[in-house]
Regions:
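Domain-scale signature associated with acetyltransferase and cell-envelope carbohydrate enzymes
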Residues: 1-120, 145-151, 184, 193-200
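Glycine-rich hexapeptide-repeat left-handed beta-helix
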Residues: 106-200
Length: 200
């Protein structure tokens, strides 16, 4: 009986129709998100965004793809300043979290894996007075902007912290924690991340 019902449903809703409906839903959802941003280039597509705040402070280039379950948070004043800038032809993996209080700048042709955190801020200073305040009530602080150059490949589950610049054409291995600047043409791995190879 169950097989019979599935056969009927398959005829009523052929795969090409389901795929078309899914595609149109994707396009509409993507337009709804991109139209809220400070700027967004042609051909950029968003899948499901779980959390978006400070959208007016977020600028994205053209032909960049965002995979599902994205967290984009730009904390700032009610002005037109750019807090998160993402270039052209980038791919942002599923479950990524990009958060800027100072600024996060990502170049062109950057590939970012799944479960990556790029966060330039913390909840308060690490002194006794701050630690006595509930974390959510502490003022956000940043040690500096995060700058990621062009043609950078960032593996799954990487964490990039504030005040870091990653040079062009670098590779960040999966599970790395980046706390210091990365020179161009470098391969970095580990926690904390260390340069294991530089291509001259």
């Amino acid at each position: 009986m169950k097989d019979f019902i599935f056969r009927i449903l398959a005829k009523l809703y052929p795969m090409n129709l389901i795929e078309k409906l899914a595609y149109y839903k994707y396009v509409i959802q993507s337009y709804r998100i991109s139209s809220r941003l400070g700027a967004c280039g042609k051909g950029t597509r968003f899948s499901k965004v779980d959390y978006l705040t400070g959208h007016q402070h977020i600028h994205v280039g053209q032909n960049t793809i965002f995979l599902p379950h994205l967290f984009l948070t730009a904390w700032g004043e009610h002005d037109d300043s750019i807090k998160i800038s993402i270039g052209d032809y980038c791919s942002i993996g599923a479950y990524c979290h990009i958060s800027a209080y100072n600024k996060v700048s990502i170049g062109n042709h950057v590939l970012i894996g799944k479960w990556v955190s790029i966060v330039d801020n913390d909840h308060g200073e690490t002194n006794k007075e701050s630690l006595m305040i509930p974390p959510l009530e502490r003022k956000l602080v940043s040690k500096g902007p995060i700058v990621i150059g062009n043609h950078v490949w960032i593996g799954d589950k990487v964490t990039i912290l504030s005040g870091v610049t990653i040079g062009n054409n670098s590779v960040i291995a999966a599970n790395s924690v980046i706390t210091k600047d990365v020179p161009p043409f470098s391969v970095v791995a580990g926690n904390p991340g260390k340069v294991i190879k530089v291509y001259e």
